[in-house]
Amino acid sequence: MKFFVDTADVKDIRELNDLGLLDGVTTNPSLILKAGRDIVEVTKEICSIVEGPVSAEVTATEYSAMMKEAAALSKIADNICIKLPLTLDGLKACKALTSDGHQTNVTLCFSANQALLAAKAGATFVSPFIGRLDDIAVDGMDLIREIRQIFDNYGYETEILAASVRTVNHVKEAALIGADVVTAPPATLKALVKHPLTDKGLEMFLADWAKTGQKIA
């Protein structure tokens, strides 16, 4: 499974990338607002940190305007992945951009039917939102299962990018089901390493080692 981080905070991205954990980055207008920086400036810096795809989202809702924004975003760096909304215009733009050799991420997916359309449009990634479905008492993982089955049935190459991930259990369940990628906030990715028995065991080993009076180096 690939790990993307869902943030526009350069400090967090650099830290996770230095750990060797990152395969890519996803951003959106809300994260750009939170970062408080110019979209071109911050996206260019992010692209210089990570080698994998960096999703940068168009804000236009009409096809021709989407294509204009996509052209501007694609000039930022070679690893830009154009993020598009799951609308008819977004799918049309996805098809055109993919045919022209660009990576695409079709976002705001909440149904298997929508994911099927994204795959038909040739999307590099489709982003089903787990947490937001959970918020309305719908099991977001059921959507991941349905998409996985459909894509496997027909051999679609579009990668399932599990988004709106809020807990370490979301990451685990997405991995068990077979999502290709998970994108999560920095804190969630860091929390994957935590287990109380790991901390307890390390504490015991260190205490016992101190009693030996030895040094390794």
From Swiss-Prot:
Gene Ontology molecular-function annotations: aldehyde-lyase activity; transaldolase activity
Signal peptide feature range: none
Entry's EC annotation: 2.2.1.2
Active site: 83
Cited InterPro entries: Aldolase_TIM (IPR013785), TAL/FSA (IPR001585), Transaldolase_3B (IPR022999), Transaldolase_3B/F6P_aldolase (IPR004731), Transaldolase_AS (IPR018225), TSA/FSA_arc/bac (IPR033919)
CDD domains cross-referenced by the UniProt entry: Transaldolase_FSA
Reactions mediated catalytically: D-sedoheptulose 7-phosphate + D-glyceraldehyde 3-phosphate = D-erythrose 4-phosphate + beta-D-fructose 6-phosphate
Keyword Cytoplasm carried by entry: yes
Subcellular location: Cytoplasm
Pathway per the UniProt entry: Carbohydrate degradation; pentose phosphate pathway; D-glyceraldehyde 3-phosphate and beta-D-fructose 6-phosphate from D-ribose 5-phosphate and D-xylulose 5-phosphate (non-oxidative stage): step 2/3
GO BP annotations, alphabetical order: carbohydrate metabolic process; pentose-phosphate shunt
GO cellular component, as recorded: cytoplasm
Keyword Transferase: yes
Keywords: Cytoplasm, Pentose shunt, Schiff base, Transferase
NCBIfam families the record matches: fsa_talC_mipB
Family indicated by similarity: Belongs to the transaldolase family. Type 3B subfamily.
Function field: Transaldolase is important for the balance of metabolites in the pentose-phosphate pathway.
Protein's name in the database: Probable transaldolase
Gene name of the encoded protein: tal
